[in-house]
Amino acid sequence: MKIIGILGIQGDIEEHEIAVKKINCIPKRIRSVSDLDEIDALIIPGGESTTIGKLMVKYGFIEKIRNLDIPILGTCAGMVLLSKGTGKEQPLLKILNVTIKRNAYGSQKDSFEKEIILDGKKLNAVFIRAPMVDKILEKTVEIISKDGESIVGVREGNIMAISFHPELSNDGIILYEYFLKNFVEKN
């Protein structure tokens, strides 16, 4: 069985652990840099990107994650952290060739659910203070999901990033299965 780590320093950690179990993988909460050596893939969860970034710096995660050669999925704040920039000064991994507009859909009270398409399948996506891709910086970045004209899902190499929270959706398992099939099992 594949072991999928969930960065466990802030954010929707438990919900991702439940989803990982549903796709017959073993979840591992990542609390220290050494935990990263024991996983086949990594999920960087939603939460507060500035807080997660500062904690990643404090505990030495930035360089280690930048040098990982495993699939990485970033959801919501995780998408922000993977990006090259946000227009705001904050710690970022800078390993995904996109810039991000933070809180593109508004505040917490503007949260919503909307049906999107991922890999030809309908998925009810939960957007909470969600970011969106502002600009694609390299042709190696592939759009995998949109909300109208807004880009809400991308992939580049072994990195996948989405604006929404699949761990909070009844059919979010579709996204985890996509990540497993197209990233984790191919690594």
UniProtKB/Swiss-Prot annotation:
It comes from the Archaea. This is Pyridoxal 5'-phosphate synthase subunit PdxT. It comes from Methanococcus vannielii (strain ATCC 35089 / DSM 1224 / JCM 13029 / OCM 148 / SB). CDD domains: GATase1_PB. Its EC number is 4.3.3.6, 3.5.1.2. The lineage of its organism: Archaea, Methanobacteriati, Methanobacteriota, Methanomada group, Methanococci. Belongs to the glutaminase PdxT/SNO family. Pathway: Cofactor biosynthesis; pyridoxal 5'-phosphate biosynthesis. Catalyzes the hydrolysis of glutamine to glutamate and ammonia as part of the biosynthesis of pyridoxal 5'-phosphate. The resulting ammonia molecule is channeled to the active site of PdxS. It holds the Pfam family SNO. GO terms for biological process: glutamine catabolic process; pyridoxal phosphate biosynthetic process; pyridoxine metabolic process. PANTHER family: PYRIDOXAL 5'-PHOSPHATE SYNTHASE SUBUNIT SNO (PTHR31559), PYRIDOXAL 5'-PHOSPHATE SYNTHASE SUBUNIT SNO1-RELATED (PTHR31559:SF0). In the presence of PdxS, forms a dodecamer of heterodimers. Only shows activity in the heterodimer. GO terms for molecular function: glutaminase activity; pyridoxal 5'-phosphate synthase (glutamine hydrolysing) activity. The active site is at C76, H165, E167. It catalyses: aldehydo-D-ribose 5-phosphate + D-glyceraldehyde 3-phosphate + L-glutamine = pyridoxal 5'-phosphate + L-glutamate + phosphate + 3 H2O + H(+); L-glutamine + H2O = L-glutamate + NH4(+). GO terms for cellular component: cytosol; glutaminase complex. NCBIfam families: PLP_synth_Pdx2. Gene3D superfamilies: 3.40.50.880. HAMAP family: PdxT.
